[in-house]
Amino acid sequence: MTDAPRRRSTPTVPAKAALEGLEDKWGERWEADGTYRFDANAPADAVFSIDTPPPTVSGSLHVGHVFSYTHTDCIARYQRMTGREVFYPMGWDDNGVPTERRVENYYGVRCDPTVHYDAAFVPPEKAPKNRRDFLAVSRRNFIELCVQLTGEDEQVFEALWRRLGLSVDWTQTYTTIDERSRRVSQRAFLDNLARGEAYQADAPSMWDITFRMAVSQAELEDRPRPGAYHDLAFHRSDGEGDLVVSTTRPELVVSCVALVAHPDDERYKPLFGSTVTSPLFGVEVPVVAHRLADPEKGTGAAMICTFGDLTDVIWWRELDLPARAVIGRDGRFAADTPAWIESDTGRNTYEALAGLGVKAAQRTTVELLEASGELLGEPKVIEHPVKFYEKGEAPLEIVQSRQWYIRNGGRDAALAEQLIARGDEVTWHPLYMQTRYTNWIEGLNGDWLISRQRYFGVPIPVWYPVDADGEVNYDAPIAPDAVTLPVDPQSDAPNGYDEAQRGQPNGFVGDPDIMDTWATSSLTPQIAGGWDHDHELWAKVFPMDLRPQAHDIIRTWLFSTMVRSHLAEGTAPWRHAALSGWILDPDRKKMSKSKGNVVVPTELLQQHGSDAVRYWAANGRPGTDTAFDETQMKVGRRLALKVLNASRFVLGFSQRNDQSADGGDDAADQAATGARATPLGADAVTHPIDRAMLAEVAALVETVTAAFEEFDYARALERTEAFFWNFVDVHLELVKTRAYRDDDGSASARASLELALSTLLRLFAPHLPFATEEVWSWWMDGSIHRTGWPTTAELGGAGDGADGELPALAAQVLHEVRRTKTEARTGMRTAVRRLEVSAPPELLDRLETVRGDLVDAGVVQEFEMTPTDAGADLTVSVELVVDDA
C-alpha cells in the first residue's frame, strides 16, 4: 500500500549534492525499513505478482542481465506506487549443465558415479589445463562441490542486484536445487505421470556426445559448418546399373536401411519396390517412396540411415523400417561388426571403422569408397546448417535411448491447438512476440524430452523392479509417496524395499537420470508462489500478473511453463508477458558468456552509478535488441545529477522562504503573530505561465501512466526526461527571479515548482530510484517508493483552462535571447539593451502575461512589443548592451 506525499514544514537541503554513496545509503535503509517487503495479508485483488526469471548460476552476470532485470524492476516499482502489493521474488537457477561445467573447470574434477564417496575430500588447489587430467570424484562429492560453488556465486549475484536497486523482496528467494524446488518439481512430475502426461520411451533422441546426454528440441540450434556432398553408387539388384545418391554423411552408409525418393518423381517410380545393395558393405535395402523426399536435392534419391537427422527418424517410423545404429553414446562406431553385414568383404571393411569417432569414420569411409570405385566424382564442398546442443561443442547425433517425456503437443494436434489458445489469454508486450510462441508450437516434431544423463539436478523420482532373473522392468516404475518428497533414487530405497535389495534379483534399481533444468524452471510460479505448502499465498499470486523474460527463451522457459500450467491448472500461468531484447556487442552479435563477448557490470556500476546504468537499460524498448553503449550511461549520470541539483534549486526557494518565516529579518514580528511557514498548495498557483506549466505536467502524468500501463518503461522514461530538461532549462530559468521575491507572484512560482518537482520525482522514481529517494528525503516523509503515483487530481485543477501555447511562446522568445548571447560569445547574465517582439496582437496579449519573467530571465532593459498583421509569424530582435571596456 502507498501513502500520499507528506511534506515536512521546512526542507533540509544539503549544501552540495552528490550521487556517490547513494546506493549503500539507501540500500541499507530500504532493507532495514522493509520498503519492498511483500504483505501476505493484502487482499488478492491488491496483489501484483511477478514470475521473476531465475538467472543461471554459472559464473557471473553480464550487462545483458542488468538490461532485462532493470525493465522488470521499473514495472514493479510503478505497480507498487499505484497501490499494488507487489510480490517480487528472486530465484537462482543453479542446477543443470552450465553449473556442472563451471564446477568441473573451477575445481578440475569430473563426476564418476563408480567412485566411492570421500567424506574428507578436498578439491585440487589448481585445476589442470587439460580436461583429460581432471580428477574423478564420486557423484555425492561432485554434488557437494556444485552446492558450495553456486552458493558463493549466488551471494555475489545478490550483492549486484542490490547495488542495481532491484526492489526484490529478499525474504522471498529460492534456488532451483533447494529442497522446496526439488519437492515441487518431483510432485509435479508424479502428477503428470498419474494423469498420463509423462511417459517413458525407448526411442531415437538427439544426443550430445560431449555431455553424454539427450537433449530436447528446444535446446537445439543450427550452426553453419563446412561439409560436402558425396555421390555414392548403390547397385541395383536386377543388374541394370547403379542408383546414385548424394549425401553429406557417407560414413552412415553402414546404417542405411532404405533409399527414398518422392512418390511423384518419374525417375524413380519404376524402382519403387525393388532393392539395391549398399556400397562397401553389400547390404540389400529397399527403394521406397515418401512425400518428404526432395526431388530438387542432390539426385532426388536419399539414404535413410538410422539415424543421420530428424527426417531419418520420421521416415524410419512412418515406413516401419529396421534400426541399424552403429554410433554409440560416446560418439564412436560400435566395436563389434553389425550382424546385418553378412558378406566377408563387408565385415572386413567394417573393421576399419570399428571404434572410430564420427569425423575419423567419415574420412576412412571416403577413402574406402574411393578405393572401391563407388565414390563418383569429386565431393562438392558446401556450407550447411548442422544441429548442435545450444551449450555443446560437437554436432549432435541421434541415438536410441530410454528417456522420459512430457506431452507438449508435438505429437498431439488437439493439445497443440489448446496451447496456442492459451497464448490468447496472455497480453504480450510487444504484441508480435505471440507469433513466435505460436510458430514454435506449430513447428514441434515431438514431445518434450525431460530426462538428462547428468548429476546436479532434480532426480527423476522413480525406481524400477528387478525380477528374479535380474532383469529390470522399466514398464512398471515405482513412485514414492508425496509425503516423502524430495527423494533421490540413487541413495533412497522405495517403499517396501531396503537398500540391500538395490540391483539384486527381486529387488530394485533407481532411475539414474535427473530432470532437464527447464523441467524445474517451468514451475517457477509454483515454487515461488507456495503451490504445495502455502495455499493462501498461492490463491493470491496465481495466475501471476507478469512473466518478464528475454525473447530468445520463448521456446524454452515460456512455453514449458505454459505447458505445465495448462496440464495442471487449466489456465495460462500469467496475465502479461513482457519480452526484453538482447544486448549486442559492437559487431551486432548477442552478448553471451559462451561467446566470450560479455561486459561485466560491476565496474560500470562503480564508474557511472546505478541510476546511470539503469537509465541506459530503461532506454531499451520492449522486445528490441539494443547495442551496448556506455555513452548513454554518461547521459544517465548527467540526468541523475541534474535531478539532484535542480531539486536543490527548487527547494532552495521554499527553504529560504520557510527559514525567513521561522527566524529571518522579520523574526520578531513573526514570533509575535505566531506566523510560521506553511507549504503552498495548488490554490496558490495563479500566474498564467505557472498554470500553463502545470497543465503540461498533468498531460505528462497521463502520458507516462498510460505508457507504464502498457509496460512500456522506455516511453515513460523518454517522455519524463524530455519534459524535465525543458522544465529546468526553460521554465525554471524563466520564473526563478520571481520565485525569490515575496509576493503573490512568488508564491505562485514556488507552489507550481514544488508541485512539478513532486510529480517529476515520482515519474522518475521507477527508473532512477536512488537519486529520487535522496531528493525526496530532503523535504518529504517516508520513501518515495511507497508514496502514491502522481495523479492529475493532486494538481488541484491549477492548470485547468490555462493557455496551453503560452510556454512555447515564452520559450521561443527566451531561446532567441540566449542564441544572440551565445553567438556574441558573452555570458547569459549579459544585459539586453532592447528586446523587440513583433507578432499579431493576439500573441502579444498573451506574451504580456509573462513580460516580467522574460525581462528577468533575459536581463532585459527595454522590452517592446510591436503588433503585426494577423497571421504573421512571431519575430524577435535582440540588442545587447555593449561593454565599452
Pin down the residues of each PLM region.
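Feature 926 captures the class I aminoacyl-tRNA synthetase adenylation module centered on the KMSKS loop
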Residues: 2-3, 231, 444-519, 523, ...
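Residue patterns forming the tRNA-binding/recognition surfaces of aminoacyl-tRNA synthetases
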Residues: 2-11, 15-16, 24-25, 29-33, ...
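Positively charged, low-complexity intrinsically disordered leader regions
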Residues: 22-46
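Amphipathic alpha-helical
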Residues: 27, 193-220, 253-256, 478, ...
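Active-site-adjacent bridging/hinge elements
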Residues: 44-52, 74, 125-133, 158-165, ...
